[in-house]
């Protein structure tokens, strides 16, 4: 990681630390510190650490130390204000590499020497320059591609819970995600505050499957200072912006786990003795999250795009918790994982009735996926919703008390979960396979129940008619 900006910045050195408070230093006697300015802290032993200015006021500055404040004394420690913001050197050479949360290589490879320097805070896209997301990204996951389609430039989070397989789903999507042939595609994967075994899983999976060739991994461990967790997603997005807007690539950014990011935000806010908001989180958490999520998108006149898939674990599976609640306001939908489906052995355990992709309609249809996609998705939602209701009713009155059509809905619900939702970890379904499978399952229902689908699509894609067409062409 480098800090550089502007011609010959003035370096100021102080030895006036008033207080060490958690990951923060309170430095007195400085009046010209700038917000986000980079700081170098030199201990009496000669050890050097990096930090940045979090708050500045008349006569003092609050400095966040990236490597932590353990061992820092208020006497004999030098604090240098470098007059620069935090930047990293970014290049397409970073694809295929593994870095720590600050952007330093940790895979044994050489440092990144070529490329351009970019401020990790990025530059927000002018709203007038934004292009509306409208192109399909195939993840190979039927529940996403078929019913909650992800579109280039979208922000589509995954809401999970402790113990659910969100990490497994994240790496499967990272391995399988594709755009139209002939277009350059890359994955930037940032693991935030993860345990050591999770970090090993991510690194080993990408390397063993070959997915590392088109990906860059940023891994921030749980035992590292909380301040680094606030840097990691911004470092990852800085690389993504270079790949997308400088090199014209389509980039999928996966951020896991944003709950760890928010916990770090709360920890540092508490150390600064700020007035807490909901459940102790800082009142500015919404705008802070927006500064990350809003770095996704497409721009007029630029070929590339950034699509974000942030993953967060909902404390106590509470979707009204401040973290998923605020995330939902900023992003364009959500994929919700179900503990009930997970306990029944269904992977991925996506609760489609609670999930939503607000931009789906823009990314599907003729020339993008298939003409029947929207109708099939609507019919799946309608039929599965009824099946879930009838399942609850059957538990009370018994299945034999239901009508023949209702029993077919129960059969549909079971087939939907066991064949459509459920798929293998290495099973990569094309959008055609997903839609054809949906038709097979919908064919369990009477044709009169498929009222969300146009007649022309029924006669073209329904297995009954496709079989007749096949027999007819075979007879000729």
From Swiss-Prot:
InterPro entries: ATP-synt_VA_C (IPR055190), ATPase_a/bsu_AS (IPR020003), ATPase_F1/V1/A1_a/bsu_N (IPR004100), ATPase_F1/V1/A1_a/bsu_nucl-bd (IPR000194), P-loop_NTPase (IPR027417), V-ATPase_su_B/beta (IPR022879). Keywords: ATP synthesis, Cell membrane, Hydrogen ion transport, Ion transport, Membrane, Transport. GO terms for cellular component: plasma membrane. GO terms for biological process: proton motive force-driven plasma membrane ATP synthesis. SUPFAM superfamilies: C-terminal domain of alpha and beta subunits of F1 ATP synthase, P-loop containing nucleoside triphosphate hydrolases. Belongs to the ATPase alpha/beta chains family. Has multiple subunits with at least A(3), B(3), C, D, E, F, H, I and proteolipid K(x). This is A-type ATP synthase subunit B. It comes from Hyperthermus butylicus (strain DSM 5456 / JCM 9403 / PLM1-5).
């Amino acid at each position: 990681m480098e800090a550089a900006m502007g011609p010959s910045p003035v370096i100021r050195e102080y030895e006036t630390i008033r207080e060490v408070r958690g990951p923060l230093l309170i430095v007195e006697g400085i009046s010209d510190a700038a917000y986000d300015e980079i700081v170098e802290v030199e201990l009496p032993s000669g050890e050097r650490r990096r930090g940045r200015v979090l708050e500045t006021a008349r006569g003092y500055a609050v400095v966040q130390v990236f490597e932590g404040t353990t061992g820092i004394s208020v006497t004999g420690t030098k604090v240098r204000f470098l007059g620069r913001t935090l930047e990293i050197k970014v290049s397409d050479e970073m694809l295929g590499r593994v870095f720590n949360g600050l952007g330093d290589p940790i895979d044994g490879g050489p440092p990144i020497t070529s490329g351009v320097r970019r401020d990790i805070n990025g530059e927000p896209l002018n709203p007038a320059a934004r292009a509306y997301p409208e192109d399909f990204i195939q993840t190979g996951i039927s529940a996403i591609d078929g019913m909650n389609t992800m579109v280039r430039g979208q922000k589509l989070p995954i809401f999970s819970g402790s113990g659910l397989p969100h990490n497994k789903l994240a790496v499967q999507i990272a391995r399988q995600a594709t755009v139209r042939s002939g277009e350059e595609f890359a994955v930037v994967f940032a693991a935030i505050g993860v345990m050591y075994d999770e970090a090993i899983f991510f690194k080993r999976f990408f390397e063993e499957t070959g997915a590392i060739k088109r990906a860059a991994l940023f891994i921030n461990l749980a035992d590292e200072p909380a301040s680094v967790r606030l840097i990691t997603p911004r470092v990852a997005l800085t690389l993504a912006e270079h790949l997308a807007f400088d090199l014209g690539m389509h980039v999928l950014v996966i951020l896991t786990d944003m709950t760890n990011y928010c916990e770090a935000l709360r920890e540092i806010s508490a150390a600064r003795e700020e007035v807490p908001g909901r459940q102790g989180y800082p009142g500015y958490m919404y705008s802070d999250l927006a500064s990350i999520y809003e770095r996704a998108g497409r721009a007029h006149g630029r070929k590339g795009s950034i699509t974000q898939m942030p993953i967060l674990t909902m404390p106590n599976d509470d979707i009204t918790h401040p973290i998923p609640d605020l995330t939902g306001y900023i992003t364009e939908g959500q994929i919700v994982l179900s503990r009930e489906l997970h306990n029944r052995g269904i992977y991925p355990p996506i609760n489609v009735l609670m999930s939503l992709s607000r931009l789906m309609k823009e990314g599907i249809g003729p020339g993008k996926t298939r003409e029947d996609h929207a109708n099939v998705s609507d019919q799946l939602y309608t039929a599965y919703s009824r099946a879930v209701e009838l399942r609850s009713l059957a538990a009370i009155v018994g299945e034999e008390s239901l009508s023949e059509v209702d029993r077919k809905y129960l059969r549909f619900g079971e087939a939907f979960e066991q064949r459509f939702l459920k798929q293998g970890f290495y099973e990569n379904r094309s959008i055609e396979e997903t839609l054809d499978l949906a038709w097979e399952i919908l064919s369990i229902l009477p044709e009169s129940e498929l009222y969300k689908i146009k007649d022309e699509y029924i006669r073209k894609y329904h297995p009954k008619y496709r079989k007749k067409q096949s027999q007819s062409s075979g007879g000729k």
